[in-house]
C-alpha cells in the first residue's frame, strides 16, 4: 500500500492543506494501525483504488472518533464487511 498516497488522501478528507506536515508522523501511524487492524480481521489490502479508499475511510473514521464512543457508520461497516467477504 502506498503510504504517501494514503497520507495525502487522509489529509484531503480531513481538509488539511497538503503543505501542513505537523501531524504527518501521527497520521502515518494511524494509517499503519488501521491497515494492521484490517489485516487482523482478515482483510488483506491490495493496491486497488477500492482498498486504498477503504483504508483511508477507516483511518479517518478512527481519527475522528478516537475520543468518543459511537458505532461505525453503516456505509463503512458494510464496505468493510463486503471487502472481508471478498477475501
Predicted features and spans:
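Divalent metal-cofactor coordination and adjacent catalytic microenvironments
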Residues: 1-87
Amino acid at each position: 500500500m502506498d503510504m504517501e498516497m494514503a497520507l495525502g488522501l487522509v489529509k484531503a478528507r480531513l481538509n488539511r492543506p497538503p503543505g501542513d506536515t505537523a501531524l504527518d508522523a501521527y497520521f502515518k501511524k494511524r494509517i499503519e494501525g488501521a491497515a494492521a487492524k484490517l489485516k487482523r480481521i482478515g482483510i488483506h489490502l491490495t493496491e486497488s483504488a477500492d482498498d486504498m479508499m477503504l483504508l483511508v475511510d477507516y483511518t479517518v473514521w478512527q481519527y475522528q472518533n478516537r475520543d468518543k464512543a459511537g458505532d461505525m457508520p453503516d456505509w463503512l461497516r458494510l464496505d468493510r464487511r463486503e471487502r472481508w467477504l471478498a477475501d
